[in-house]
Amino acid sequence: MAHEAMEYDVQVQLNHAEQQPAPAGMASSQGGPALLQPVPADVVSSQGVPSILQPAPAEVISSQATPPLLQPAPQLSVDLTEVEVLGEDTVENINPRTSEQHRQGSDGNHTIPASSLHSMTNFISGLQRLHGMLEFLRPSSSNHSVGPMRTRRRVSASRRARAGGSQRTDSARLRAPLDAYFQVSRTQPDLPATTYDSETRNPVSEELQVSSSSDSDSDSSAEYGGVVDQAEESGAVILEEQLAGVSAEQEVTCIDGGKTLPKQPSPQKSEPLLPSASMDEEEGDTCTICLEQWTNAGDHRLSALRCGHLFGYRCISTWLKGQVRKCPQCNKKARHSDIVVLYARTLRALDTSEQERMKSSLLKEQMLRKQAELESAQCRLQLQVLTDKCTRLQRRVQDLQKLTSHQSQNLQQPRGSQAWVLSCSPSSQGQHKHKYHFQKTFTVSQAGNCRIMAYCDALSCLVISQPSPQASFLPGFGVKMLSTANMKSSQYIPMHGKQIRGLAFSSYLRGLLLSASLDNTIKLTSLETNTVVQTYNAGRPVWSCCWCLDEANYIYAGLANGSILVYDVRNTSSHVQELVAQKARCPLVSLSYMPRAASAAFPYGGVLAGTLEDASFWEQKMDFSHWPHVLPLEPGGCIDFQTENSSRHCLVTYRPDKNHTTIRSVLMEMSYRLDDTGNPICSCQPVHTFFGGPTCKLLTKNAIFQSPENDGNILVCTGDEAANSALLWDAASGSLLQDLQTDQPVLDICPFEVNRNSYLATLTEKMVHIYKWE
């Protein structure tokens, strides 16, 4: 009857709690929702029946704006259910006297009647309705969740709690038969101290677990377990905090007098994400010998061999101590001393296969691009060579056509008839309307020692050899540039260590000057950059030089022993041919190149070389070989040898001898005849002789050139050392046209043309005299 009365009171209290509205005092002063709290222990009825849960008084609500929590009910004398929170501290019973009395009463009843079970079911239903009311009053937490949450039913935990109820110790049986309490575990972020409203409330986890404390038999336990499962499935949803969640936990415990003390929330800590299990199973983290993961400490720590493969230290050490002392992966020889311990926590290979593939593609593309550029350059070079060759062949065809048209006339006329024609031409018999008039004088070197001149038509400048103007600071010899456009001299360009004996400009390469010196070298100097671009060492003093007019890349250098060295400007090391002197080994005082097929009377091309004793014509063959022809000149006394390419004439100068008391300049016409085998024999025939002064101490260079009148006549200019003048002759008539006076003996003569005006320059040791044809 006592049990039935107790059950009836419980049911009445439950119904009363459902119908009674919450008092207005429950509202929080901060605006937060008031939570239900169990009544204190002194409200329990005299029959020992609890009054179930009543609204908590207003003073229980935290004044620091912390959300009010559900407080556990005090210890009652009804052995109904046991509510626990797994993983948290157990709320101890503060009133052992009531529990002891109920324990003694409950020891006598080991079986629960059907009415008691029905009362328990009603009681649990009331708890579920209270839980629904709490959920209705609780604000939505979907927008205030701190971290990822998950729900988990703790059915197994409640069953373990029921199973352990029958095995309690004696100290556990001293507890109250009705050991029911609530513990709401919430984790919340730190709240501001200003206000508290429904938005700041952020519950994270809440557990409500009902367990049985009865010592009944197995049937009652099973029946009671079903009731608990039904209660949990209907409303007791447990929220737990996951590993990545950052939260703080509040615990509420029950003490004497019904007061509650909330535990302060622990500081929030961010825990790093644990590595996934799949990373531990990767092949790169396991030893290939034992197929287990290596460690960063201990006897199985990460180690490597000289070949680079990774193993555990214990495994590879045991492996190498055996008979097979090779790497388990690549079979390379290894020793125990080759083991190297790697101090690394983890290893992870970066996938660079795509990057390496792109690099290889880039290298391949660059290689193909370079190959294409090289092929393009080769094609351009071949095109240039073929274009030059085609131009030369076209020019030769034109010359051969002229030769064919005049062949009959040349066969009918005797040798020397052309000289008679020149002397009898009407233009040569009449007086010249124009003369050379003195224009200007330039001082080249105060110290003297100037020797030779050359004119560059592409740059419109005249270069004169001279010693260095600052011999103490920069000794040697060079050239001074004289602009013919404004008739002003410019800078000095140093070139050689000794006196310069020959200067010549290329007809194909712009501004490239060839110079020969007594310092055993020939040099190529660019006047566009004023720098020496190539130097050749001839081994002997070089007296003269010239360019090949049929092949733009070949040059000739006349040595002191009478030999001629042939150089290819594309070969920077040494000469490609050497033409040995045929007779006397005397210095080559002059070299002049006569291009092939320049005239129908003499179609062959080659270099004319004049020494102090004789002269030779080196015929150039198609394979760039040279065949010598000794010219029939007077023996001894030759000091200069000049050519005129258009008319195929040459001018040979002799010094005075016992048979001739003055300087003689003989105009020669180049000729040829065929021998029995059909090979040509080159020779020359005298046309006119021009006489000068009786003195010849200097090797004066004379000039033979076309008349500025462009009438086909040829002019000859010779130097006269005795009179300090330059004599201008008409080659057709042999008559003297002008006597150009200077202050010193003339050393070199150079005609040139600028802006359709013809000029003549004469060089002495210190000065240059400019004359204009007017």
From Swiss-Prot:
- GO molecular function ontology, one term from the record: zinc ion binding
Q: Which disease is it linked to?
A: Fanconi anemia, complementation group W: A form of Fanconi anemia, a disorder affecting all bone marrow elements and resulting in anemia, leukopenia and thrombopenia. It is associated with cardiac, renal and limb malformations, dermal pigmentary changes, and a predisposition to the development of malignancies. At the cellular level it is associated with hypersensitivity to DNA-damaging agents, chromosomal instability (increased chromosome breakage) and defective DNA repair.
Give yes or no: UniProt keyword Zinc.
yes
Against Pfam families, the record matches this protein to:
WD40_RFWD3, zf-RING_2
A Gene Ontology annotation in the biological process aspect, one of them, is:
response to ionizing radiation
Q: Tell me what this protein is called.
A: E3 ubiquitin-protein ligase RFWD3
Q: Segment Disordered: which positions?
A: 95-116, 139-225, 257-280
| Post-translational modification note | Phosphorylated at Ser-46 and Ser-63 upon DNA damage by ATM or ATR. ATM phosphorylation occurs at early times upon DNA damage, while ATR is the major kinase at later times. Phosphorylation by ATM and ATR is required to stabilize p53/TP53. Part of the phosphorylation depends upon RPA2 presence.
Reaction it catalyzes: S-ubiquitinyl-[E2 ubiquitin-conjugating enzyme]-L-cysteine + [acceptor protein]-L-lysine = [E2 ubiquitin-conjugating enzyme]-L-cysteine + N(6)-ubiquitinyl-[acceptor protein]-L-lysine
Q: Which GO terms describe its cellular component?
A: cytoplasm; nucleoplasm; nucleus; PML body; site of DNA damage
SUPFAM superfamilies in the cross-refs: RING/U-box (SSF57850), WD40 repeat-like (SSF50978)
Lineage runs: Eukaryota, Metazoa, Chordata, Craniata, Vertebrata
Q: What happens on changing L518A?
A: Does not affect interaction with the RPA complex and subsequent recruitment at DNA damage sites
Which proteins does it associate with, and in what oligomeric form? Interacts with MDM2 and p53/TP53. Binds to the RPA complex via direct interaction with RPA2. Interacts with RAD51.
| Regions of compositional bias (Basic residues) in chain numbering | 150-162
Q: What positions belong to coiled-coil segments?
A: 361-413
